[in-house]
């Protein structure tokens, strides 16, 4: 279940879901309709932990990525081959780092979902070395696609024809 806002009604709905057996919830640090800000991220992660639950978080620096997308559009770079160009590794790593600092302050374990690069994974390694409980999911297929795309220009647009 995704949590996209933090208010009294959401808190009640989450408790109802917990009563039905749901123990993990997904949060987003990106996507305008789903993003939770840092304050709510902290409050949600802390509250879930206090209830014996945890959060899986999709980590990206939404502000910079949105700016990069606008720049790419202005340059006519609209194809799927430009996807990794507007989502540099550093923007995921920054968001993972920020999440881990927030989770540490909340005293809560956390899961990073859709991890896509080494820089972001290094943030997780550091947090684990410092005693934090961090789980991560790295979707192999998307990683292979992104790595191949970087090695073979226009791979996605060529493959998409078939």
Task: Give residue ranges: language-model regions.
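Histidine/acidic residue-rich metal-binding segments in metalloenzymes
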Residues: 9-28, 33-162
């Amino acid at each position: 279940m995704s949590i996209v806002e933090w208010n009294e009604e959401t808190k009640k709905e989450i408790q109802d879901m917990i009563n039905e057996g749901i123990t993990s919830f997904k949060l987003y640090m990106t996507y305008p309709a789903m993003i939770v800000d840092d304050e709510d991220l902290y409050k949600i992660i802390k509250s879930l932990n206090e209830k014996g639950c945890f959060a899986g978080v999709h980590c990206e620096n939404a502000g910079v990525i949105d700016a990069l997308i606008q720049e790419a559009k202005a340059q006519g770079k609209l194809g799927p081959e430009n996807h990794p160009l507007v989502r540099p590794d550093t923007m995921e790593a920054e968001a993972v780092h920020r999440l881990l600092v927030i989770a540490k302050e909340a005293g809560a374990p956390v899961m990073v979902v859709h991890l896509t690069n080494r820089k972001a994974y290094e943030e997780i390694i550091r947090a684990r070395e410092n005693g934090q409980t961090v789980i991560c999911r790295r979707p192999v297929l998307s990683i292979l696609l992104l790595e191949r795309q970087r090695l073979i220009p226009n791979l996605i647009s060529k493959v998409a024809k078939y």
